[in-house]
């Protein structure tokens, strides 16, 4: 998934902006698509946004006022950050690549809990507050 995200050649997510796109194209080829131009503002591949939130940064709604945080760093990224404005408040996650691995910053809104699952296998449930792991 990270290779596809970082790929500047077709098919790859960076191919589109590298070739002038500011939206998601229906066809990987954009204006050079066989049979003529397809939609240049299409949601067909928009699921990458869910992947950025739910996998790369690991934010998932687990139920009423409960979240699962399970980030999966990778690729050549030095950091990633995402937040979700729930009806209970903002939950946010940031990870940074360090010399020794990764550092995680997590913020859980009031009256909520989060099950944190890190790639190294560490698991813990946390309440509202700010955490560095």
Model-assigned labels for residue ranges:
Residues 2-133:
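Non-catalytic C-terminal accessory modules of carbohydrate-active enzymes
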């Amino acid at each position: 998934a990270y290779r596809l995200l970082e790929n500047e050649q077709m098919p790859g997510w960076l191919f589109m902006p590298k070739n002038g796109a500011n939206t998601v194209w229906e066809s990987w080829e954009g204006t050079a698509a066989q049979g003529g131009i397809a939609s240049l503002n299409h949601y067909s591949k928009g699921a990458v946004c869910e992947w950025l939130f739910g996998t790369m940064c690991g934010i998932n709604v687990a139920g009423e006022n409960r979240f699962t945080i399970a980030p999966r760093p990778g690729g050549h990224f030095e950091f990633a950050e995402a937040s979700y404005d729930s009806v209970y408040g903002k939950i946010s996650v940031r990870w940074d690549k360090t010399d020794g691995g990764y550092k995680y910053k997590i913020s859980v809104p009031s009256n909520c809990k989060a099950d944190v699952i890190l790639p190294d296998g560490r698991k813990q449930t946390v309440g509202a507050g700010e955490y560095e792991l």
